[in-house]
């Protein structure tokens, strides 16, 4: 059995040092509860509701050379956990809404958000790395960010690439994802870990309700709408590595791709 966790927090806009301190405390709390994988919200270090692209460019960092990735690697080394966390990435003059994956031995990889939501299109470029699955040794973790959930192809692609767990850093403002993510878990026979934020930022209110969902569409843990907190759940990887739903049906082998896009 493996334990996974979400960190639900209220990042302060353009205050990375304060956000590092808060995140470290909550990651350590999850680690004390036995979590081996901890997922943080989208843009956990920078805040979300930017006013200008220049504002984002000033605070965004390189991956993995930047301060945020270094901070996460240090915490992962100190706690022995694996971390998936959302951050603003600077690559030359280009900005991405990204997630980094780190572990006790350092940097593992990154994902760049493919489906940008609303005003994010003013600041970031769509991701160009594809949907990625990272092998942690004891399990495989796929990553998607916030609005990616709205497109079922996102979770399906990660599942087809072998993800046991889908890590889902988010800054949710619409109410639908907490209802939809158990279905994403069910239809792909994976676990999902959605780490949302709370609070209000420059007039934009976030819904909280971070959750862990099972391949049976069970909600194993759900956070409140307002509080900073950690949620931990034990998961059974056997359930996600067997894609059969009965003796005659396998959700991947029964796919009829030749009819899906006509």
Swiss-Prot record:
Temperature dependence: Optimum temperature is 80 degrees Celsius. Active at a broad temperature range (60-90 degrees Celsius). Highly thermostable with a half-life of 25 hours at 70 degrees Celsius, 9 hours at 80 degrees Celsius, and 6 hours at 90 degrees Celsius. Shows a Tm of 112.7 degrees Celsius.
Coiled-coil regions listed: none
Known catalytic reactions: a nitrile + 2 H2O = a carboxylate + NH4(+)
Keyword Ribosomal protein: no
Keyword Hydrolase: yes
Regulation of catalytic or functional activity: Enzymatic activity is inhibited in the presence of acetone, methanol and metal ions such as Ag(2+) and Hg(2+). Is also inhibited by various thiol reagents such as DTNB, p-chloromercuribenzoate, p-hydroxymercuribenzoate, iodacetamide and iodacetate. EDTA has no influence on activity.
Domain of life: Archaea
PROSITE patterns (alphabetical): CN_HYDROLASE (PS50263)
Binding-site residues for substrate, renumbered to this chain: 173-174
Entry annotation: catalytic residues: 42, 113, 146
pH dependency: Optimum pH is 7.4. Active within the pH range of 4.5-8.5.
Residue pairs linked by disulfide bridges in the UniProt entry: none
Keywords: Hydrolase
Catalytic class of the enzyme: hydrolase
EC numbers on record: 3.5.5.1
GO molecular function: hydrolase activity, acting on carbon-nitrogen (but not peptide) bonds, in linear amides; nitrilase activity
Occurrences of domain CN hydrolase (ranges): 2-237
Quaternary structure note: Homodimer.
Record family assignment: Belongs to the carbon-nitrogen hydrolase superfamily.
Functional note: Nitrilase that hydrolyzes preferentially aliphatic nitriles like malononitrile and fumaronitrile in vitro. These dinitriles are converted to the corresponding monoacid mononitriles, showing the enzyme is regioselective. Cannot hydrolyze compounds with a nitrile group bound to an aromatic ring or amino acid. Its biological role is unknown.
Name recorded for this polypeptide: Nitrilase
Organism annotation: Pyrococcus abyssi (strain GE5 / Orsay)
């Amino acid at each position: 059995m493996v334990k996974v966790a979400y960190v639900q927090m209220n990042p302060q806009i353009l205050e990375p040092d304060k956000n590092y301190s808060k995140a470290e405390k909550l990651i350590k709390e999850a680690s004390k509860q036995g979590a081996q994988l901890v997922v943080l919200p989208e843009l956990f270090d920078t805040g979300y509701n930017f006013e200008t692209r220049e504002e984002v460019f000033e605070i965004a960092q390189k991956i993995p050379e930047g301060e945020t990735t270094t901070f996460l690697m240090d915490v992962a080394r100190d706690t022995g956990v694996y971390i998936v966390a959302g951050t603003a990435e600077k690559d030359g003059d280009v900005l991405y809404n990204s997630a980094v994956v780190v572990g006790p031995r350092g940097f593992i990889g990154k994902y760049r958000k493919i489906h940008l939501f609303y005003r994010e299109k003013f600041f970031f470029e769509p991701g160009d790395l594809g949907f990625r699955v990272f092998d942690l040794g004891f399990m495989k973790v796929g990553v998607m960010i916030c609005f990616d959930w709205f497109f079922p192809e996102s979770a399906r692609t990660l599942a087809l690439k072998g993800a046991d767990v889908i890590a889902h850093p988010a800054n949710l403002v619409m109410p639908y994802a907490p209802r939809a993510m158990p279905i994403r878990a069910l239809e792909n026979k994976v676990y999902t870990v959605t780490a949302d934020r709370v609070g209000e930022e420059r007039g934009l209110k976030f819904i909280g309700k971070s959750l862990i969902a099972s391949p049976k569409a069970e909600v194993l843990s759900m956070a409140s709408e307002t509080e900073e907190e950690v949620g931990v759940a034990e998961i059974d990887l056997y359930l996600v590595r067997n894609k059969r739903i009965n003796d005659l049906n396998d959700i991947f082998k029964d796919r009829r791709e030749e009819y899906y896009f006509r």
